[in-house]
């Protein structure tokens, strides 16, 4: 059972003045304080736990984020950054005496550099939108969480998201080249860049998966890849989950890295088949769905 911290009564008593101060930093409509509107931010995808935040603010520039964080630190106000709220881990669960910093308005693709095989985007750009921006030139962004149509790249960095293809192509941390982040004192720093061997310490791995605890991401440089010439999927049935697991181990130990590999046990097979009617076989105990990509 998750126990939320007891709200700071002193901060809650200043709610009206805090909202007024925020409205001097961002447009009036970018501060959300009505009870009805705050309901939309009371949880992320982990809906078993929910509570409305004290306020929500929707900045549109790095300068906005910096000013808000400086103010929050000076006034001892808690901040919870939020992308699209698709996480199932509670990473964007708000605090009753805190401000949710919604980054949905940061949704621009800033630069596409095919020569260096990278794209610079704002954190509110969705995962799938990156691929959509480059696919006409034969490129794509490899990490593909199941929520890729909705989840944002900023949230992917915060959660170090993966997906079906992470076995071969890695998680978010393996596919980001640079970040612009705003520290909790409002300072803006840049880490990495378009080139693999950028100067300075490699702190990107520390930030990937930190859920906004170390700073707020305001710009991301991601690696893009050429689309494989072909991709084929196969479905393999097994009489036990142990046999399926051993098959995975045998494939990897043979030095073969499929583009994607997913295993389903009997309950998952039946649940999926009842819902989507994908024509999965019901007479097996486990399934491996394997994708092979590369030359035809």
Annotate each predicted stretch with a short phrase.
Residues 2-4, 49-55, 234, 285-294:
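Short, hydrophobic beta-strand segments
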Residues 1-70, 74, 86-117, 146, ...:
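N-terminal flexible segment immediately upstream of the FAD-binding catalytic core
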Residues 108-264:
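FAD-binding subdomain of flavoenzyme oxidoreductases
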Residues 260-296:
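Terminal amphipathic helices with adjacent charged low-complexity linkers/tails
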Residues 80-82, 91, 122, 144:
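Structural motif
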Residues 1-14, 36-40, 57-58, 63, ...:
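Feature of Fe-S/electron-transfer and energy-metabolism proteins
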Residues 89, 100-103, 213-221, 295-296:
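Short, acidic (Asp/Glu-rich) active-site segment that either coordinates a divalent metal cofactor
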Residues 39-40, 87-90, 127-129, 224-226, ...:
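Flexible loop/turn segments at secondary-structure boundaries
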